[in-house]
Curated annotation (Swiss-Prot):
Signal peptide: none annotated. PANTHER family: EH DOMAIN, GH06923P. Residues 15-36, 69-148, 217-238, 378-409, 424-448, 567-674, 748-769 are annotated as: Disordered. GO terms for molecular function: calcium ion binding. Residues 783-872 form the EH domain. This is Increased rDNA silencing protein 4. Residues 26-36, 99-114, 384-393, 616-627 have a biased composition (Polar residues).
């Protein structure tokens, strides 16, 4: 209803506007007619003069001038023709001006194209471009200032042609009622039909229902399941995991901050104030007396303890160097101003190396037996940019005896890396390089003594009675034999840490790493342990040598005392005798020297990496040592050493012996090669004849069914000796013992003792029957020629036949069709009397099984099949002796 009211109001407003402009349009038309040189005469009523009616005026907002293309391009004039909507029942024509160049011919319709207008005047030929009729431009509206608003509802369709216009006889004006109806019809046409099939799916639900469903779905998705209540165990695990995470993060932070610090277990860097609160006394290790710690002042534990330390070639003390370091570190935020304090428990050794490995300087302090020498000293650049190279080569020595501190020479010095940002000013002489790789002899035996049993590590282990496995992986021990200073090599001075005399250790303090006992031998133990055994005529001894030892190379520097030292014997077997004779002579002279020096205690450096700990510890106090070689006397020599070194000689002399007996064949292979009746397609070796196993199985069926119902046969059978049958009864004398016992037990053939005795007398107790022709017949013995020659029926007893009905019942159990069973019967039946002999029945059973295996029946049974049944029925089974 609301839409209809709005349409009516719009139509009335348009009608009133058009009526008011009627007078103005008339005046304009009259002026144009006077000024225009193209004036059309009044039209004469004729049927041929059918013109297209003038289009009604459109509203001003929607009206616009339309440019048209005409043949006369020079005279392009834009004109507007408008006519007011005539009143009802008025048939008079309205004069309008026309031009030959352009003409407005736009028609707008809301319903259809059937309502057209008719003009009383003829219209000139005007070619309009249909593609431009619907386009309105602002420029055209400015040029056509004379155009007035056209009535939208009175315009016809723009797509209608001129031919349709001339067909209408008269002009049919639009009334306001018609316009209102048109608007209503157009609005109703645009409405969606009230058809359930054309509705959308959402139209079936009201907006409230849709919103409700949406809210419920969102609420269900937003609801999260309530977390389960954690038990006490879960809470405890969570707490432990959090603690572990915090510890791990703290460790990572500490490792990042001090990644270059290697501390032995039990060392703490703390400030003086923290130590005073703990209330325990700190000790500094005294090298002169390794068993007693020396107490020191807490105030001397910081950098102040270096006040009395002076270099030999400089007047500057280490205190000034330390202050300079602290000042520079404060500027660079590298080291900080915190003073370091070292506490040394009694059970741990001191080996601290706080260095920055990223710099070019590597400072390494070597602690020898006196504790007052450093292989690589502390080199530092003074304030003027000069470096004390003498400190780098010879180390820092304590010469100031007037200080209040204790003697530094008796204490372990802690070298601290002095950071210097100016790397270019550091001398290249302090730069270190790696030791060259070991020789071929060392690589051959796979020894790595430079890593595990270096001079520094052995020295520290001996000082503190610790084995290598007690040191943590975070400890950083700079090995002197693993680094060589360039300055020392240039000066030609031997490295202090590489000589054997500088690395001697007391026996009593040495604790060796634990390895397997010497009794547990291994196939390559000779190469690993570096053990060389000699078979001497006078005495037996074992020499423990280190294949990586430097004693052989430095034998000349040790006064020629180590010239007898050799590596592990790698010569050929032919040169062993000569080497042993030379070694015996050398050992005899050396033993005399050792007896003179028994009272003297000689320190040694045990460098054997894989030497047995238990054997050396037990024999250490009994044997003698010299120049890094451990010699065990005959009393302390292991008992198994001589036995093992004799075993290879015996094995070489003993010839190779082969087994006298042949090995048994593989039973599993034999089992596979046998024929499997359930899988006959896997082996075809036994398919052409009967095997012993099959024949025994078929004979069992034969024995169980032979002679049944044969006495009921009324037809005379071929080859049967009826002389053994008397009065319809079968004599038991010609029947096997087993059959005889079966007949007697069933009382089928009763017999008396007299008949048996008479039969035995007539046959002399032999059971041999004499035929009528004088030939001897024995049912127990079958001639192979007769068994194989089936063309001629042999003489058989009635009890040795099996009836055809019984054979059919036995063979029918196989499930084969009767046609197949008939073919098998025809292949084996030679007597043609409805019975089968033993051989015929066995071959028939074999053919039945072959059919069950899937083989085709042959046209004729091969002779090899009949030959496989030959023999006297005696089988000899040979069992293998175990």
């Amino acid at each position: 209803m609301a839409s209809g009211t709005a349409a009516n109001a719009a139509a009335l407003a348009a009608f009133n506007a058009g009526k008011k402009r009627d007078d103005g349009w008339k005046q304009n038309n009259e002026g144009n007619n006077k000024s225009s040189k193209y004036v059309c005469a009044p039209a004469v009523k004729s049927q041929n003069n059918k013109v297209k009616p003038a289009a009604p005026a459109a509203p001003a907002a929607l009206a616009g001038a339309v440019n048209t293309n005409t043949t006369n391009t020079t005279n392009t004039v834009t004109t507007t023709s408008a006519s007011t909507t005539p009143k009802p029942k008025s048939n008079h024509a309205v004069h309008r001006d026309t031009t030959p160049t352009s003409m407005v011919n736009q028609q707008y319709s809301q319903n259809n194209d059937r309502i057209m207008t008719k003009s009383p005047r003829p219209v000139l030929n005007v070619n309009t471009d249909s593609s431009k009729q619907g386009s309105y431009s602002s420029a055209a509206s400015k040029n056509n200032h004379d155009n007035k608003g056209l009535d939208y509802f009175n315009l016809g369709s723009a797509t209608s042609g001129r031919s349709d216009t001339f067909k209408l006889p008269r002009y049919l004006p639009h009334t306001p009622k018609d316009m209102i109806n048109n608007v209503k019809s157009s609005i109703e046409a645009k409405n969606i039909a009230n058809d359930p099939s054309s509705r959308r799916l959402s139209a079936n639900y009201s907006p409230q229902q849709m919103l409700k469903n949406l809210k419920t779905s969102l609420n269900e998705k937003s609801k999260a399941p309530a977390p389960p209540k954690a038990s006490e165990n879960d809470k405890g695990r969570q707490i432990l995991s959090d603690m572990r995470e915090r510890l791990d993060t703290s460790r990572k932070i500490a490792a990042d901050q001090a990644a270059t610090r290697g501390l032995a277990p039990g060392f703490d860097f703390e400030e003086d104030g923290d130590k005073e609160d703990k209330g325990y006394e700190d000790y500094t290790w005294n090298l002169t007396d390794r068993k007693k710690p020396v107490s020191s002042n807490r105030s001397a534990k910081s950098f102040k303890s270096f006040k009395s330390v002076k270099s030999t070639n400089s007047n500057k003390t280490v205190n000034s160097i330390a202050k300079n370091v602290v000042t520079k570190a404060g500027e660079n935020d590298q080291l900080g101003t915190t003073e370091l304090n070292i506490s040394t428990p009694e059970r741990h050794g001191i080996c601290i190396d706080v260095t920055y490995h990223d710099s070019d300087v590597e400072d390494d302090c070597l602690k020898n037996e006196n504790g007052n020498k450093c292989a690589n000293g502390i080199g530092h650049e003074n304030g003027h940019g000069t470096q004390n190279e003498n400190n780098v080569e010879n180390g820092i020595r304590n010469e100031n005896q007037h200080d209040n501190e204790s003697d530094i020479g008796d204490q372990v010095m802690v070298p601290i890396k002095l950071y210097n940002s100016d790397k270019s000013s550091i001398s290249s002489k302090s730069k270190v390089r790696r030791k060259p790789p070991p020789s071929l002899s060392q690589e051959e035996y796979g020894s790595s003594s430079t890593e595990l049993l270096s001079t520094d590590l052995k020295h520290i282990m001996a000082l503190h009675a610790k084995s290598s496995d007690t040191f943590s992986s975070g400890d950083n021990f700079n090995q002197s034999d693993d680094q060589i200073s360039i300055a020392e090599n240039d000066a030609g001075q031997p490295n202090v840490g590489t000589t054997a005399a500088a690395t001697l250790v007391r026996r009593g303090d040495t604790k060796f790493p634990q390895f397997p006992e010497i009794k547990k031998k291994h196939y390559h133990s000779r190469n690993i342990f570096g053990l060389k055994r000699h078979d001497h005529r006078n005495q037996n001894s074992v020499i423990w040598l280190d294949p990586d030892s430097d004693v052989e190379a430095e034998g000349e520097g040790l006064g020629g005392e180590a010239k007898y030292v050799r590596g592990v014997n790698r010569k050929s077997a032919g040169e062993d005798d000569e080497l042993e004779e030379e070694e015996e002579e050398e050992q005899d002279g050396e033993e005399e020297e050792e007896e003179e020096e028994e009272g003297n205690e000689v320190e040694e450096n045990e460098e054997s990496e894989f030497s047995d700990a238990s054997a050396i510890a037990n024999n250490f106090n009994h044997g003698n040592t010299k120049n890094g070689v451990r010699r065990l006397g005959p009393q302390s020599r292991p008992q198994q050493a001589h036995v093992q070194q004799q075993q290879p000689q015996q094995s070489q002399q003993q010839p190779v012996q082969f087994r006298t007996t042949m090995r048994t064949t593989n039973k599993r292979k034999d089992r596979k090669s046998k024929f499997d009746e359930y899988k006959p397609w896997k082996n075809h070796s036994d398919l052409n004849y009967l095997t012993d196993q099959e024949r025994k199985r078929y004979e069992g069926v034969w024995v169980s069914n032979k002679g049944n119902y044969t006495n009921l046969v009324v037809v005379k059978l071929h080859g049967v000796d009826y002389s053994t049958v008397k009065d319809g009864k079968v004599n038991l004398e010609h029947i096997d013992d087993s059959m005889r016992a079966a007949l007697i037990s069933t009382n089928a053939y009763p017999s008396s003792k007299q008949e048996e005795q008479e039969s035995m007398k007539s046959n002399n107790g032999t059971g041999i029957k004499v035929n009528s022709d004088g030939s001897v017949y024995n049912s127990a013995i079958e001639v192979p020629s007769q068994a194989n020659n089936q063309s001629r029926p042999e003489r058989v007893e009635l009890s040795q036949l099996i009836l055809g009905a019984v054979v059919k019942r036995i063979w029918s159990r196989s499930g084969l069709p009767d046609e197949t069973l008939e073919q098998i019967w025809n292949l084996v039946d030679f007597r043609r009397d409805g019975t089968l002999t033993k051989n015929e029945f066995i071959v028939g059973m074999w053919l039945v099984d072959q059919c069950l295996y899937g083989r085709k029946l042959p046209k004729k049974v091969e002779s090899i099949v009949w030959e496989s049944l030959g023999g006297i029925g005696v089988n000899i089974n040979t069992k293998k002796m175990r």
